[in-house]
């Protein structure tokens, strides 16, 4: 049986962390790609030299040519410029759209059968553009955002309640930005909806509201603390969870940026929704029932994503 091949397009902080985790978990052979000569080779060699310590039998290679990703089963895209303090994800649009064009063309030419996970911000617009540039089937191109945002939500809930993260199921939908929608009614701690936790005195409504707001600002909190970059450990782990569900046909339902073709009343756009990920890629979108407040928040988030998509079309007319 042939080994899986994982191509990591972008060898910065997230790319390097992805390579380390993928190697340690033996998901397959790892190719690190970057346009910066020496960077993917150096990180690949460093991680390869660590594998005898933990006994992982994987091959790692760094490349500067898209030909090196040929035949990849999974491509995880982190290429682009990260956020700096004071920047929103949307500020990256013009720069990273050009990067997505080059990446999409590279994947189309050398790894057209891959399952593609995009991490580059602004996420929802970038994954939409990447699918257009690559021409891959929409079910084979997804964005990593909701897994990360939901993980942050779950961690903050665990921190407040003292309950293990293993018994917390948090959902965050919508665009990956300040208008994201942490789903209070659909998230649970020990099986109890968060609304019931408030009623039982685990936390006040004000404390829950603060956790929801901290979740929305979670990425910015880390950017401000680091001062020279953005989060990379949690984003990498989130993408690995998505890749594993695809490679092992786990059929996990994860909140990811998926292509909507009528679901949630949306067409021809990517946004964060619960998605069943298996060997076919994004196999099915799960549709939550929204109350009036949730729908209003989701619609606002969708409007923000639509604005970014329209901006992409303005920058690159080939996307119109």
UniProtKB/Swiss-Prot annotation:
The record's annotation in InterPro entries points to: L-lactate/malate_DH (IPR001557), Lactate/malate_DH_C (IPR022383), Lactate/malate_DH_N (IPR001236), Lactate_DH/Glyco_Ohase_4_C (IPR015955), Malate_DH_type3 (IPR011275), NAD(P)-bd_dom_sf (IPR036291)
Q: Which Pfam families match?
A: Ldh_1_C, Ldh_1_N
Q: What name does this protein carry?
A: Malate dehydrogenase
Reaction(s) catalysed by this chain's protein: (S)-malate + NAD(+) = oxaloacetate + NADH + H(+)
Locate the active site. Answer: 176 (proton acceptor)
Reading the lineage from the top rank, the first entry is Bacteria
Q: Which family does it belong to?
A: Belongs to the LDH/MDH superfamily. MDH type 3 family.
Gene Ontology MF terms in the entry = L-lactate dehydrogenase activity; L-malate dehydrogenase (NAD+) activity
Kindly give the PANTHER family that the UniProt entry links to this protein.
Answer: L-2-HYDROXYCARBOXYLATE DEHYDROGENASE (NAD(P)(+)), L-LACTATE DEHYDROGENASE
Q: Which Gene3D superfamilies match?
A: Lactate dehydrogenase/glycoside hydrolase, family 4, C-terminal (3.90.110.10), NAD(P)-binding Rossmann-like Domain (3.40.50.720)
**Which sites bind NAD(+)?**
10-15, 34, 96, 119-121
């Amino acid at each position: 049986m042939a080994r899986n091949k994982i191509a990591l397009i972008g060898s910065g902080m997230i790319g390097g962390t992805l390579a380390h985790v993928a190697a340690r978990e033996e998901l397959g052979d790892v190719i690190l790609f970057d346009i910066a000569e020496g960077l993917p080779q150096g990180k690949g060699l460093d991680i390869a030299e660590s594998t005898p310590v933990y006994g992982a039998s994987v091959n790692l290679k760094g490349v500067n040519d898209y030909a090196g990703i040929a035949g990849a089963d999974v491509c995880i895209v982190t290429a682009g410029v990260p956020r700096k303090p004071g920047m929103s994800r949307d500020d990256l649009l013009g720069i990273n759209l050009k990067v997505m064009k080059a990446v999409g063309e590279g994947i189309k030419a050398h790894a057209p059968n891959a399952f593609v996970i995009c991490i580059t911000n602004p996420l929802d617009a970038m994954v939409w553009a990447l699918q257009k540039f690559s021409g891959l089937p929409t079910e084979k191109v997804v964005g990593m955002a909701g897994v990360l945002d939901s993980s942050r939500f779950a961690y903050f809930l665990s921190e407040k309640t003292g309950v293990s993260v293993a018994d917390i199921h948090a959902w965050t939908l919508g665009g990956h930005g300040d208008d994201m929608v942490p789903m209070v009614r659909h998230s649970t701690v020990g099986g109890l909806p968060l609304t019931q936790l408030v009623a039982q005195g685990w936390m006040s409504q004000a404390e829950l509201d603060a956790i929801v707001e901290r979740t929305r600002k979670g990425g910015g909190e880390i950017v401000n603390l680091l001062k020279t970059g953005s989060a990379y450990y949690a984003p990498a782990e989130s993408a690995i969870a998505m890749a594993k569900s695809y490679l092992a046909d786990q059929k996990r339902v994860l909140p990811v940026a998926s292509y909507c073709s009528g679901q949630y009343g949306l067409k021809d756009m990517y946004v964060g929704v619960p998605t069943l990920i298996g060997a076919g890629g994004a196999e099915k979108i799960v549709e939550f029932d929204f109350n009036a407040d949730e729908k209003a928040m989701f619609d606002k988030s969708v409007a923000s994503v639509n604005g970014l998509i329209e901006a992409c079309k303005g920058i690159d007319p080939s996307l119109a």
